[in-house]
Amino acid sequence: MLSKQIPLGIYEKALPAGECWLERLRLAKTLGFDFVEMSVDETDERLSRLDWSREQRLALVNAIVETGVRVPSMCLSAHRRFPLGSEDDAVRAQGLEIMRKAIQFAQDVGIRVIQLAGYDVYYQEANNETRRRFRDGLKESVEMASRAQVTLAMEIMDYPLMNSISKALGYAHYLNNPWFQLYPDIGNLSAWDNDVQMELQAGIGHIVAVHVKDTKPGVFKNVPFGEGVVDFERCFETLKQSGYCGPYLIEMWSETAEDPAAEVVKARDWVKARMAKAGMVEAA
């Protein structure tokens, strides 16, 4: 019987670095998490996962079965380096190939949701042409995802093109495809001049998961919980009252900390306390 508890997960980059997924999932289980979100970022090391052999993919599946800790989502931030909106055809082609490989990887290992980075370009100057190419790239990507039955979900970003749920909904309406949805980050959403609660309500019906982190205006990473501007209790209340029942993912970058597990436990307890105040069922 499926649990009615709220699924609470941890980002891979919060845990000690390394390629042994059995160890990582065992640690996540010990720390009380239901799932781990995989990162495929712009580094060669993590990008190489998309070229894993059949045996390496099977090892991940076996680790999931052995531990009972799922890997249901992938944070695909590699498109910073290979953006779908690039005016360099070769770079854009690499971006689309990364998307194809990520979707195939997800299909092979049971990942259900690929979180997309909402950058038309990241290291270059954006313009109308980069935005057009980005839209076309998303359209092509969603067609691939549809065939594989893998959901692509847009993150609310630290970047003006996709810094609100309202803007991301524009792409959802443009693509008009059930395999394209939203994966908001309440930290990023709160760091901009957004009516956060109204934005969350607007996204209901399209939100497939929620990133949980603290931020300050202009500071989108490594803000300790409780030291930023995010009103977690109100965000959790709004999502609960709006009928959202999906997973929450604590996003941290403590993999290089002296004691990553201790940092994660501290964050986990802080977040769960805010969830309890919001009247949500505590995650295990």
UniProtKB/Swiss-Prot annotation:
Single Gene Ontology MF annotation: intramolecular oxidoreductase activity, interconverting aldoses and ketoses
Recorded catalytic activity of this chain's protein: L-ribulose 5-phosphate = L-xylulose 5-phosphate
Biological processes annotated in GO: L-ascorbic acid catabolic process
HAMAP family: UlaE (MF_01951)
Record has Isomerase as a keyword: yes
Induction of its expression: Induced by L-ascorbate. Repressed by UlaR.
Name of the gene encoding the protein in the UniProt record: ulaE
Family indicated by similarity: Belongs to the L-ribulose-5-phosphate 3-epimerase family.
Function statement: Catalyzes the isomerization of L-xylulose-5-phosphate to L-ribulose-5-phosphate. Is involved in the anaerobic L-ascorbate utilization.
Pathway involvement of the protein, from the record: Cofactor degradation; L-ascorbate degradation; D-xylulose 5-phosphate from L-ascorbate: step 3/4
Organism whose genome encodes this protein: Shigella boydii serotype 4 (strain Sb227)
Transmembrane segments: none
Keywords: Isomerase
Listed SUPFAM superfamilies: Xylose isomerase-like (SSF51658)
Entry protein name: L-ribulose-5-phosphate 3-epimerase UlaE
EC number(s) per entry: 5.1.3.22
Transmembrane as UniProt keyword: no
Pfam families to which the protein is assigned, alphabetical: AP_endonuc_2 (PF01261)
